Amino acid sequence: MDGFSRRILWLEVVHSNNDPKVPASFYLNQVKELGGCPLLLVSDCGTENGIAAAMQCTFRAEDQDELHVAGEKSHRYCSSLANQRIEGWWSFYRRNRSNWWISLFKDMVDYGLLHLGNALHMECLWFCFSRLLQDDLNKVRDHWNSHKISKSAYSAIHGVPDVMYFLPEYYAHEECAISVSEEQTKEMEVHCQGEVDGSLYEEYFEYVLETEGRVYPGTVKEALTLYQHIIKLQNE
């Protein structure tokens, strides 16, 4: 999330966020897209943010500025509770959307359809629902970025995140991104990676779709039906 505009920059479904290379890849992709890095990067204290923090400090290693947030000071760890902007957003998301998904998966557990300790079940759940989850996240992100945020106790500046992000001068502010060259970003690519696709489970699930003439589910009902069908095949 951009600190000034509160615009969501990326919102991605991944197998796990414990691998620091995964969030680092999202951070680096954003730097490439913008051609620059933030003046200051703030993250919680989880070890998964270590590589992104190191990249930020490297990009700003030679900088000097009046705010004294260059070099190693260009990244700051803070507790989740202290980062009110992003914590407020996660609260918004949970109230308005994620509780629905959580309830769905809990119901699957309660009805004996999903066993959390079963690798096949978890991989099948990912295969059947991950694209739908990502589509849902994209809609939530786009809605948030295009709606008007009301004035709050944490920020006197308010408006539409997309407008604030792309037109900061309209709010008497200026673009603060620090230029990063293509050469610099290429040097960092070795330190991050996207999610690894093509597991044996996924190959099998794709085989089932192909041999039975099925298509990837486009609705939650279709995803649940496919999930139950694949699990049933394995139990026969």
Residue ranges: model-predicted function:
Residues 2-154, 207-236:
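RNase H-like DDE/DDD metal-dependent nuclease/strand-transfer catalytic core used by mobile genetic elements
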